[in-house]
């Protein structure tokens, strides 16, 4: 990218192309407390130096363009430009490096994840000088965090609403995910809640299809909730998916859920979009509804190690946009999820203050100030034999969600729910007594089988089920 300039005497500036690093690579820059900081994994095209590639990322995601423009003289680039302030190698990767970029806060609209992402992960990801680009992490400064409402309620408020303490919450996704009539769907919801689960859930692609329109589903699920509550004395819920083709229709569905008196609704936040999600989160806080978030489409964005965006960034964005639960992988189930990386973004979802810890993929210290936390949801290919590991990995402030692991029980839906509840209670009691779930987990489950034929049957059915595939997106240095 050699400079090619000609002087326009009538204007008094040099037109043409100049190297990005001359303006946007500033290793001497000291970051401000108000800057949004980004860590990018950069794979430049052959012949493009790291400093030029890192500067190009900073430029194209902030104030820069491919050529010099005379209107640069009408503003202060020093005030508004992004800056690549540090570059470090990636262990074991000769062609990759991490570029750290600082963005001034004035570049972003207050309270808008949509605007933040449009800049930081916008056109720059198609830049020809880069073979691949991945956003690994963001530091959201408190000054920007305070412009967001965040989760509608948060962990403590949810526990108080449900009157459930001292253990993970239990859920189940109703299967088959598509094709049931509303009445049969409601029957499955009732059986699972009656058997001991706290929640049941619409699958992410259940919206309002010809076989089951949303209003019918909402009505039969509400009936199931009230009937199971009356019979068990426990507060129950079903994640009613309000995701729709327009924001207006989505809010209409949430309004109907509130009128039914149910405790929680659901949204597919990536396919629905951050603008829609933030709008729904505001409605939920104003109207006392909890909000469950599904991350459908996330693997399109986050699964490949060299290009896209890590889920820890999507998790931070969700905490800003708003949600009380979000799916976060399982580590032990059928879906992708490295253990240390998963534990890292689980902390980013739940905790108020998280220290930088590269061993868990956390590039920046994050202070959420007063923003409520989000419950991570473990879901996907899990069953009763996984209960000790899930309890040990995710702890009490989580939702453990068994779809096939409930509805696949040989005796039916309610016995499947009983099996999961007994296994969970046994694991929590054993942990509270000081037993090591990681070492004694299988023994703890077997002991509980003596008191629960439903659990014994579940253990027999799923004793050989494994999902032993290598993790694709491992932390650096784990290959």
Curated annotation (Swiss-Prot):
Where in or outside the cell it occurs: the entry states: Plastid, Chloroplast
Catalytic activity entry: 2 (2R)-3-phosphoglycerate + 2 H(+) = D-ribulose 1,5-bisphosphate + CO2 + H2O; D-ribulose 1,5-bisphosphate + O2 = 2-phosphoglycolate + (2R)-3-phosphoglycerate + 2 H(+)
Q: Which GO BP annotation is one of this protein's?
A: photorespiration
Single GO molecular-function term?
A: magnesium ion binding
Which cofactors must be present for this protein to function?
A: Mg(2+)
Please identify the protein, giving its name as recorded: Ribulose bisphosphate carboxylase large chain
Q: What is its EC number?
A: 4.1.1.39
Q: Which residues does the entry assign to the active site, renumbered to this chain?
A: 175, 294
GO CC terms: chloroplast
Propiece residues = 1-2
> What does its PTM field state?
The disulfide bond which can form in the large chain dimeric partners within the hexadecamer appears to be associated with oxidative stress and protein turnover.
Q: Which domain of life is it from?
A: Eukaryota
Q: What InterPro entries does the record tag this protein with?
A: RuBisCO (IPR033966), RuBisCo_large_chain_AS (IPR020878), RuBisCO_lsu_C (IPR000685), RuBisCO_lsu_C_sf (IPR036376), RuBisCO_lsu_fd_N (IPR017443), RuBisCO_lsu_N_sf (IPR036422), RuBisCO_lsuI (IPR020888)
The record describes how the cofactor is bound as: Binds 1 Mg(2+) ion per subunit.
In the record, Phosphoserine modifications are located at 208
PROSITE patterns in the cross-refs: RUBISCO_LARGE (PS00157)
Q: At which residues is there a site annotated Transition state stabilizer?
A: 334
Q: According to its UniProt record, which protein family does this protein belong to?
A: Belongs to the RuBisCO large chain family. Type I subfamily.
Residues bearing Phosphothreonine are 330
Q: Which organism is it from?
A: Lobularia maritima (Sweet alyssum)
